[in-house]
Amino acid sequence: MRVIAVNGSPRKKWNTATLLKNVLEGAESQGAETELIHLYDLNFKGCKSCFSCKTKGSRSYGKCAVKDDLTPILERIEDVDAVILGSPIYLGTVTGEMRSLMERLIFPYLTYTNPIQSLFPKKIHSAFIYTMNIAEEQIEEYGYATLFNTTENYLRLIFGEAESLFGYDTYQFRDYSKVLADRFDEKKKAKRRKEVFPEDCQKAFDMGARFAKNE
């Protein structure tokens, strides 16, 4: 059993990365081999619209033809039993690096046939972990539900199984006194990080363990 987690946050030790690490720890508890990839360490770009992945007879049919730091990551994902993507929400969507990964990861496997099919070689577990500043009850107000549902639907279409995990109302700064952010109540944020974030981490751990047991 092999599990890969991909961190789309520029921060390697904060909310998104912490939840992803808990997923991998859960998988490791069941004997899985794991890997955590930090996208911001890589030099890559999104889809170049070359359509080599869609061209009849192309050596790259069903695969991204672009060669850069992301190429070996995409190749390794083909061999895993579970893939978990994670990103904070920036301006109402995932980070630019995560979006670029998703273009290169999902689009080549997506056929332009009727009906649409997946060229991914097998069915695996997949999930997306989101972290964000807003509270759960604000999801509809900010229009995030559409993003979450669309992403989960694409993951399910390509990989066969998909789910989402959310970290709401996260503690954003190490020291709120140094940042002009008076719309946030630092004490409430700190209380939630102490009381609720550990529950989110447990959910992530349980997800990883469940994936590793192939449940």
Task: Give the label of every model feature segment.
Residues 71-75, 129, 174-178:
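Membrane-targeting and insertion segments and their boundary/processing signals
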Residues 96, 109-164:
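Short, glycine-/small-residue-rich phosphate/pyrophosphate-handling segment
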